[in-house]
Amino acid sequence: MGNNVFDVLKERGYIKQTTHEEEIRDLINKDKITFYIGFDPTADSLHIGHFLPLMMMAHMQKAGHRPIALVGGGTVRIGDPSGKSEMRKMLSKEAIDKNVSSIKSQISRFIDFSDDKAILVDNADWLLNLNYLEFIREIGVHFSVNKMLTAECFKQRLEKGLSFLEFNYMLMQAYDFLCLNRKYGCVMELGGDDQWSNMLAGTDLIRREESKSAYAMTCTLLTNSEGNKMGKTVNGALWLDKDKTSPYEFYQYWRNVDDADVEKCLALLTFLPMDEVRRLAALEGNKINEAKKVLAYEVTKLIHGEDEAKKAEEASEALFGAGKDMSNVPTVNISKDDLGKGILDILVETKILPSKGEARRLIQQGGLSINEEKVTDINMAVTEDLFEENSIIIRRGKKSYNRIVIE
């Protein structure tokens, strides 16, 4: 690779903080290193917030470095307090195992694990059977409680209450880095910027225990031009699993980003060359929509594959452009027995909306249409006369569409 990958990551806007910028630049330019990123399996899918670290990981792998993807099957039993205002609910072992399995398969879509090019580990393998006394003697001795209490991840929790369980999280994450350093020669941790305190603890532990240098580099959080987190939809998070967020809904999210966010999203969420990113971002007026189409297609292709990206693009064209093929618009089926039911029941039973409260609110705010006719009555019945060619088109907000078909 001609460019130093550090400069590539910097130019594209990934890097937020580093422990030793010049040392890291030299290290990843001149040597091939092993680095890791951790993913806690708190849900059965990764979401768009995890995608930036995954992209960072992919850029590093393309430059010849070896990634370790660590799934936190052990640490998730504690719960990371970073950025959380209250304690997370504890997950059952079965739920954790299911989540770990799903996340491992998702990571494999972005990272090449063939021929030892990358390693996938679960920290449950070394955390579950830790001897508490040995751990406290070997690891705990290096941690100053006074210093830990000044860490950003604990500050906001001290007033509301921080359990001893969660207070241990920093030690566990630092210990992960030490284990990976000892077993695989891992010298760098990458992660979200909310992990900075935990990552510094790991580099410090390796320095004290192994008398070696270790490094940390954080990834910027995905925010819009106003500084708000991106990736929220009416149905919650923007998931990478197509059963939780359909490829069409995913595509439409990026198709509808603000003009001011196009360049940032193209740089962070695609592999398009930066010259092309700048060219697309410089388009003005209606032409910026072409850049948004490219963004939506490229990101959807990376997450869901080329076929799903094409289908989502065609569905979008059918609804907003000159296309007439509605077959790729997200479609749900109802039976003739469902005819006559209320609109709220239909919307929830078909999973177009997550709850009747959400559906009621949307209608009251004037945000729901059937066949481009605004729905004003929350008690309206869905009857056969509404259907044209056996289907109706539901529009939520300005640009979220679903088709309902009678089986």
Curated annotation (Swiss-Prot):
Catalytic reaction(s) noted: tRNA(Tyr) + L-tyrosine + ATP = L-tyrosyl-tRNA(Tyr) + AMP + diphosphate + H(+)
GO-annotated biological processes: tyrosyl-tRNA aminoacylation
Compartment(s) of residence: Cytoplasm
Pfam family, one: tRNA-synt_1b
RNA-binding as UniProt keyword: yes
Motif segment ('KMSKS' region): 229-233
Chain residues that bind L-tyrosine: 36, 169, 173
Residue stretches spanning the membrane: none
GO CC entries: cytosol
Keyword field: Aminoacyl-tRNA synthetase, ATP-binding, Cytoplasm, Ligase, Nucleotide-binding, Protein biosynthesis, RNA-binding
Function of the molecule: Catalyzes the attachment of tyrosine to tRNA(Tyr) in a two-step reaction: tyrosine is first activated by ATP to form Tyr-AMP and then transferred to the acceptor end of tRNA(Tyr).
Subunit (UniProt): Homodimer.
Family according to the record: Belongs to the class-I aminoacyl-tRNA synthetase family. TyrS type 1 subfamily.
Entry protein name: Tyrosine--tRNA ligase
Species per Swiss-Prot/TrEMBL record: Clostridium tetani (strain Massachusetts / E88)
Gene: tyrS
